[in-house]
């Protein structure tokens, strides 16, 4: 059996926490920032966890954690 390869694009976007959940960055903080409120931009700057519905797919893309 060949080794299971990690999807490198997913490895750059997600990181696993100590409890086994996956951290990700929020969207909408790249451009067109002038119309967004400062409070919204601060909230978007914080990382969040991957939803339960998507966690299985992320886990499959990152077999080695």
UniProtKB/Swiss-Prot annotation:
Entry's Gene Ontology cellular component terms: large ribosomal subunit
Keywords for this protein: Ribonucleoprotein, Ribosomal protein
Residue numbers spanned by region Disordered: 1-65
Any GO BP: translation
Single GO MF annotation: structural constituent of ribosome
Biased composition (Basic residues): 1-11, 21-43
Family of the protein in this entry: Belongs to the bacterial ribosomal protein bL35 family.
Record protein name field: Large ribosomal subunit protein bL35
Source organism (scientific name): Desulfovibrio desulfuricans (strain ATCC 27774 / DSM 6949 / MB)
């Amino acid at each position: 059996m060949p080794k299971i390869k990690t999807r490198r694009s997913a490895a750059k976007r997600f990181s696993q926490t100590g409890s086994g959940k996956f951290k990700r960055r929020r969207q909408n903080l790249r451009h067109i920032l002038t119309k967004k409120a400062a409070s919204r931009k601060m909230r978007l700057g914080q990382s969040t966890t991957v939803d339960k519905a998507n966690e299985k797919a992320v886990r499959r893309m990152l077999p080695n954690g």
